[in-house]
Amino acid sequence: MTLQQIKEIYSRPLTELILQALEIHNKNFGNDIELCSLKSIKTGTCPEDCKYCPQSGHYNTSIEKHKLLDKDSILAEAKNAKDAGSKRFCMGAAWKHIPKKDFDQVAEIITEVKNLGLETCVTLGSINADEATKLKQAGLDYYNHNLDTSREFYPEIITTRKFEERIETIRNVANADINVCCGGILGMGESLDDRFNLLLELLQLPAAPKSIPINTLIPVKGTPLGDKYTNAQIDSFELVRFIATTRILFPQARLRLSAGRENMSLETQTLCFLAGINSIFYGNKLLTENNATVNSDNFLLAKLGLKSNAELC
């Protein structure tokens, strides 16, 4: 697949593009939505300078910071997520690298969440090959490590971690036989070519991602992008085109509509489902920011006649 071929797919008439994406989707998935819950288990004071992130220690934001939560409180959240209908429990920690003093505790938490009957996913920053192997032994199903944007636009967003470091972490995850969860953020001021190059980078990863989060920028006051923009720099049609193109390129991946969904109309979300989305974060909170409400999600899924994949198991 070349950059030009991706452009040609994206540029098709919208109805034709959505129809092809829907046909590919229906060949590979049932009529279900994967519900995932996301919990910030360590919040704030991150040494990274990601210009979109309120958890960066470089910026003055109003988030409530806390160290790694205790195991019991995390397990209580996981049980609540399962009872609410989630199939996967994702845990995020604002680290560049997981501290050695916290590694064993995180591994134990993964094991106990897995024992609840939930799929497990974590995002802990960069990890080496040995750490990836130990996380696999603990029962980890998915490791999230987003590319965020194209290799070319990346230095405009992050300077504290090289793009190639992200690729290396994904290689370590794949070599440990952990499913790769990797996507990006749209609406940060990137060009269309940057979005196409992001897709090309995802195609060239050491292992094909089984899960692709598609985020739109949530401008948070105090961050460079939050002070620059009042909303994500992408319209609904561009978003739907990007999702449909991603579905065509990744026929067997779960595509998750992630950050920014709270600001989308139900009609826009419906178009996203038609274009290939079959996973959402479920719950009123998304790390430190608000998410679409559970009531709103239940209403929309009922209107569309969609069930969670947990209900179908």
UniProtKB/Swiss-Prot annotation:
- The enzyme's first-digit EC class, named in words, is transferase
Q: Which NCBIfam families match?
A: bioB
The pathway it acts in is:
Cofactor biosynthesis; biotin biosynthesis; biotin from 7,8-diaminononanoate: step 2/2
Task: Report the gene name.
Answer: bioB
Q: Which reaction does it catalyse?
A: (4R,5S)-dethiobiotin + (sulfur carrier)-SH + 2 reduced [2Fe-2S]-[ferredoxin] + 2 S-adenosyl-L-methionine = (sulfur carrier)-H + biotin + 2 5'-deoxyadenosine + 2 L-methionine + 2 oxidized [2Fe-2S]-[ferredoxin]
Subunit record text? Homodimer.
Biological processes, Gene Ontology terms:
biotin biosynthetic process
Q: E.C. number, please?
A: 2.8.1.6
Query: What family does the entry list?
Result: Belongs to the radical SAM superfamily. Biotin synthase family.
InterPro entries in the cross-refs: Aldolase_TIM, BATS_dom, Biotin_synth/BioAB, Biotin_synthase, Elp3/MiaA/NifB-like_rSAM, rSAM
Which UniProt keywords are present, listed alphabetically?
2Fe-2S, 4Fe-4S, Biotin biosynthesis, Iron, Iron-sulfur, Metal-binding, S-adenosyl-L-methionine, Transferase
Q: What is the protein name for this chain?
A: Biotin synthase
Keyword 4Fe-4S in the entry? The reply is yes
The Radical SAM core domain covers 28-258
List the lineage, top down. Answer: Bacteria, Pseudomonadati, Pseudomonadota, Gammaproteobacteria, Thiotrichales
Binding-site residues for [4Fe-4S] cluster, renumbered to this chain: C46, C50, C53
Q: Which residues bind [2Fe-2S] cluster?
A: C90, C121, C181, R256
Function summary: Catalyzes the conversion of dethiobiotin (DTB) to biotin by the insertion of a sulfur atom into dethiobiotin via a radical-based mechanism.
* Entry-linked Gene3D superfamilies: Aldolase class I (3.20.20.70)
Q: Which Pfam families match?
A: BATS (PF06968), Radical_SAM (PF04055)
The cofactor note from the UniProt entry for this protein is: Binds 1 [4Fe-4S] cluster. The cluster is coordinated with 3 cysteines and an exchangeable S-adenosyl-L-methionine. Binds 1 [2Fe-2S] cluster. The cluster is coordinated with 3 cysteines and 1 arginine.
Give one GO term, molecular function aspect.
Answer: iron ion binding
Needed co-factor(s): [4Fe-4S] cluster; [2Fe-2S] cluster
**Which species does the entry assign this protein to?**
Francisella tularensis subsp. novicida (strain U112)
